[in-house]
Structure formats: C-alpha cells, structure tokens
Regions:
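A compositional/biophysical signature of low hydrophobicity enriched in polar/charged and small residues
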Residues: 1-156
Length: 156
C-alpha cells in the first residue's frame, strides 16, 4: 500500500506521465532528486508498472467497443481463458467475474462487422460454451487513476 506522498506522486504521473520530477516535487513538497528516488523505488517494487500515453481508440481506427460475457465449459482455468484471449489484439481487457458468466472481455473493433468476426472467433474457442455481448453506445466515464480506496470510498 502506498503512503500519502507516494500516492500523490503516482497520481501526478498518472495525469501526465511526461511531467518532470521538478514539477512533481513542487506539487508534493520534495526536491526533484527525492521524487526520482521515490519513483525508482515504486518501479522496483512493482507499484509503478510502466509509463504510457492514453490514446482515443477512434484515432487508431477502433470505432466499435463492446463487452463480451464468456461462459466456459466446466473446469476451465483462468489461465486457459487468459491464453485464449491474449491472442486477440482486439481484446484490450479481460477479467474473471462473479455471477453467471466466467469472464468478461472488453473488445475494440474497427466496425460492427469486425466486432462480429471477433465475437465469432472467441465463441469458437475450445473452452467457450457460449457468449453474450453488449455494445457501447457512448462511453460515460473512463478513469485512468484514482486515489486509494481507503481515502476515496464513500462510506455509509
């Protein structure tokens, strides 16, 4: 678990991964070298797994987004599902879930026909019994960074 200072540094980097250590230092009250040491430590411990950019999927030609519920044949391991789905560049996220489905995959496609082809290929995987999909009409909220649950959770 990150302490408050590390969390503020991570939040600053999540907002802008190109932000300088000096700029972050001004935000959190540390020198640039102190921020760098903390970032290096956070990378070494795996708290920071990389630095990236956020790109609008439509700018790359991904015009259609959907979620696919995957219902697996009995005794399918999460590792089998992961190996099956990681072959599809269109699958940008996948998780095992509670409820009737075994997993949910987020899929981007160039258009409806492309989405349909991806859905057919996923449904044809040996571990898949059936699928159910929903298409995104309008993304309402996408968060790439948030504070820790202890500080931000709305309690009763």
């Amino acid at each position: 678990v990150l302490n408050d200072l590390d969390e503020r540094i991570v939040h600053a980097l999540a907002e802008d991964a190109r932000r300088s250590y000096a700029d972050i230092g001004q935000l959190v009250g540390l020198s640039a070298p102190a921020v760098k040491r903390r970032v290096d430590r956070l990378r070494a411990t795996g708290a920071i797994t990389g630095f990236t950019v956020r790109v609008d999927p439509a700018a790359l030609g991904w015009e259609t987004e959907g979620f696919v519920e995957i219902y697996c044949r009995s005794n399918t391991s999460p590792e089998t599902i992961q190996r099956g789905l990681e072959r599809y560049q269109e699958v940008v996220a996948a998780s095992t879930v509670t409820g009737d489905a075994d997993a949910v995959a987020q899929v981007f496609a160039s258009d409806m026909r492309h989405f349909e082809r991806v859905l057919e290929r996923i449904a044809g995987e040996p571990f898949v019994e059936r699928t159910k999909s929903v298409l995104v009409l309008s993304p309402l909220l996408r968060r790439f960074s948030s504070g820790s649950p202890a500080r931000d959770a709305a309690g009763p």
